[in-house]
């Protein structure tokens, strides 16, 4: 269980920091004569990075995990009735 928590934490950090590595081209000194690629890559990058842009593919998964549970007598409350509450009502 601890191993899966570590894996989930590392995966979360990787995904949350991924936006920092987007649109950072290799400097032109490392690639001599390839300055055109440098300019094209800079022009294709958005000027303002939004944190949610990179995480759009996770939206359906997050919505499923955050969805409230509903029950017969407590629709939308997200609370599960215990046997004591059932016997009482």
Swiss-Prot record:
This is Neuropeptide S. Pfam families: Neuropeptide_S. One of its GO terms (cellular component) is extracellular region. One of its GO terms (biological process) is positive regulation of synaptic transmission, glutamatergic. The lineage of its organism: Eukaryota, Metazoa, Chordata, Craniata, Vertebrata. Residues 1-23 form the signal peptide. InterPro entries: Neuropeptide_S. Its main location: secreted. It comes from Bos taurus (Bovine). Residues 24-67 form a propeptide. It is found in: Secreted.
């Amino acid at each position: 269980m601890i191993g899966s928590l570590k894996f989930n934490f590392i995966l979360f950090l990787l995904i949350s920091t991924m936006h920092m590595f987007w649109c950072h081209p290799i400097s032109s000194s490392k690639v001599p004569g390839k300055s055109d690629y440098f300019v094209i890559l800079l022009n294709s990058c958005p000027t303002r990075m939004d944190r949610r842009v990179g995480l759009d593919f996770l939206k359906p998964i997050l919505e499923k995990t955050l969805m409230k549970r509903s029950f017969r007598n407590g629709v939308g409350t997200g609370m599960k009735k215990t046997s004591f509450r059932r016997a009482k009502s």
